[in-house]
């Protein structure tokens, strides 16, 4: 059941879609911003179901952007199944994506079916929790930026790489962690170059975000306080357009630059939230 108290307006859906598109693939946590931006604007929390459904726009964008990569992965897996060519780079990438999806799939479905109501109202979704998590993850990203050797490339990905990065992806069920941030951090710690780390993060997110969005879409549409089809379509469409632009920008950016700008942003974001929350609580 969706955890909002009022239907979503078209303006709210548009803003949430833009926020989703900007933050899903940047290592700054879309879940945190989708929780915090409505709070700052005085809107109701859109809830787990609506935010997950709007993520389908990001799924459409990443599938469209990486359509050639995905076609090659499917072709590689097909060759491996038919001819046993499991050392093929495209087949290995497909296997890594499957293995990397399992941790968040198990954890996410467990939360959905056994702790959904508790998770939706959990202290993990509170502003101070999101702020603290954002600061902690910024520090981990900073350490990864300093320590990683930057030698691994996507063509050499293994099932072990998929599992390691997949475990990091599972941490994204905690608001403020950032799915792209946790996977990028784990990849950098594991020795990937920045651009390929981001590319694998995007590809790995396709199954996880797709499943989460489809599972929650019915709930977002079916409850009396839900968003309704038109606002959801507005949110999904705006998320798709902005996500495409964000993916393209980040891949180009990381070919020439480090992730320090995101470390700084997350530190300022987290500290600013704590100050805002303290001021609001005092009044």
From Swiss-Prot:
This enzyme's EC code(s): 3.6.1.27
Example GO BP: cell wall organization
Keywords: Antibiotic resistance, Cell inner membrane, Cell membrane, Cell shape, Cell wall biogenesis/degradation, Hydrolase, Membrane, Peptidoglycan synthesis, Transmembrane, Transmembrane helix
Catalytic activity: di-trans,octa-cis-undecaprenyl diphosphate + H2O = di-trans,octa-cis-undecaprenyl phosphate + phosphate + H(+)
Molecular functions per Gene Ontology: undecaprenyl-diphosphatase activity
Membrane topology of the entry: Multi-pass membrane protein
The keyword Transmembrane helix belongs to this UniProt entry's keyword annotation: yes
Annotated family: Belongs to the UppP family.
Additional comment: Bacitracin is thought to be involved in the inhibition of peptidoglycan synthesis by sequestering undecaprenyl diphosphate, thereby reducing the pool of lipid carrier available.
Name this polypeptide is given: Undecaprenyl-diphosphatase
Provenance organism: Synechococcus sp. (strain CC9902)
């Amino acid at each position: 059941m969706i955890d909002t108290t009022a239907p979503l307006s078209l303006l709210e859906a548009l803003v949430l879609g833009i926020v989703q598109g900007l933050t899903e693939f940047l290592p700054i946590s879309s879940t945190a911003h989708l929780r915090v931006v409505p709070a700052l604007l005085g809107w109701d929390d859109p809830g787990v179901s609506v935010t997950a459904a709007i993520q389908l726009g990001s799924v459409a964008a990443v599938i469209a952007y990486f359509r050639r990569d995905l076609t090659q992965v499917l072709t590689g897996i097909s060759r491996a199944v038919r001819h046993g060519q499991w050392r093929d780079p495209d087949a290995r990438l497909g296997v890594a994506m499957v293995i990397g999806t399992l941790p968040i799939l198990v954890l996410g479905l467990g939360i959905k079916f056994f702790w959904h109501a508790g998770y939706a109202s959990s202290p993990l979704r509170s502003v101070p929790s999101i702020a603290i998590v954002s600061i902690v993850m910024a520090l981990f990203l900073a350490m990864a930026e300093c320590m990683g050797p930057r030698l691994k490339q996507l063509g050499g990905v293994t099932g072990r790489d998929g599992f390691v990065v997949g475990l990091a992806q599972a941490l994204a069920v905690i608001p403020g962690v950032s799915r792209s941030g946790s996977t990028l951090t784990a990849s950098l710690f594991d020795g990937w170059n920045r651009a390929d780390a981001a590319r694998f993060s995007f590809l790995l997110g396709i199954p996880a975000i797709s499943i989460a969005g489809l599972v929650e879409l019915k709930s977002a549409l079916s409850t009396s306080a839900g968003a309704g089809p038109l606002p959801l379509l507005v949110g999904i469409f705006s998320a798709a357009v902005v996500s495409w632009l964000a993916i393209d920008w980040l891949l180009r950016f990381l070919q020439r630059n480090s992730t320090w700008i995101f470390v700084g942003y997350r530190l300022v974001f987290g500290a600013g939230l704590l100050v805002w929350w303290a001021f609001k609580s005092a009044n």
